[in-house]
Amino acid sequence: MNDLTKKSVEELKKLEEESRAELFALRFQSAMGNLEKPHRIGELKNQIARILTILSARKNSGENTAINVKVNLNETYAKIEKESQAFAKQRKAKIEQMMAEQQAAEGKMANLMDLPVNDAMDLTEEQAVVSTPTGETNGLDEQKAPVAAKKPAAAKDFPKQKDVVEEKTATGKPAAPSAKKAPVAKKDVAQETKTDKDAALKALIKEKAAAKKPAAKSKTSTPSGKTTVTVKSVTSAKADIEVPKETSKPVPTKTVKKAAELNAKEKLVAIKSSVAMGGTAKEPGSGVKIDLELKAKDPNAKEYTYGTNWKENRDKILTASKTTKKADDKTTKKGTGKK
């Protein structure tokens, strides 16, 4: 903004025309689908608006702003094309560099997949140690120490890789590459440790089951009416559930049935007797009367069926359409109001 204020009116006019030409070229590129610098469109719009505000301020101050400036549009368009091509080359180079880095990383991962599992793990650990600083490596060693202490003692009986190589060289036999035999020894150790762990777990499970059997078999005394569950063994998932038998309801006798039937008959007789003839209903203790008599029909009433007087209505409509009312003389004559 400060740079624009320092320029003269001619320079501002020239810059305005150049920025308008560049904006037109960029919009044409966007319409064609090969726009390289979309952010430049907003910048040009803001620049043109600032130039116009400065010119209007100078016009208000009394300076002459009505100056025509000629700009060679061919040069401006050629300049814009060169800038866009250079920008496209830079962007292409950046994209190729990113693709090469990605392919290199994928190639390293493919090499790790080809190697055995133990070698790949060793390589990844080495890379992690190299990438971490010295302060963090001490922390990693401290974390690895308890893990190494938790390993079974069976793994210590096997000789290390270097000892095996030294024994073979002493006997005179050619020493085989260590990378092939190290994983085999580790696999054997892992299998033996797994079998030892399984045996120890089975023994613990048996001891716990034997300790819990007498306690599980003893039945607890429960109050009547509640369900009791007795578990035979800890390992089995089945359980015997004892449900108390429901108490049988007393079967109604013949005398009780007869008494109920008599009571129902008495109630029916009472209801029938309460209803009286003549449209009145009586209930015990109510005495409410309902009059169902209808009003007598008026003998002088005329009956009319819809559409019977259509002829009369037609004649009335015809006479009304033919005859027109004449206006009064008082309303048609113009006068002064004096008689």
Curated annotation (Swiss-Prot):
SUPFAM superfamilies: Ribosomal protein L29 (L29p). InterPro entries: Ribosomal_protein_uL29, Ribosomal_uL29, Ribosomal_uL29_sf. GO terms for biological process: translation. Residues 145-156, 171-182, 217-238 have a biased composition (Low complexity). Residues 1-96 are annotated as: Large ribosomal subunit protein uL29. GO terms for molecular function: DNA binding; structural constituent of ribosome. Keywords: DNA-binding, Ribonucleoprotein, Ribosomal protein. Belongs to the universal ribosomal protein uL29 family. This is Large ribosomal subunit protein uL29. It comes from Spiroplasma citri. The gene is rpmC.
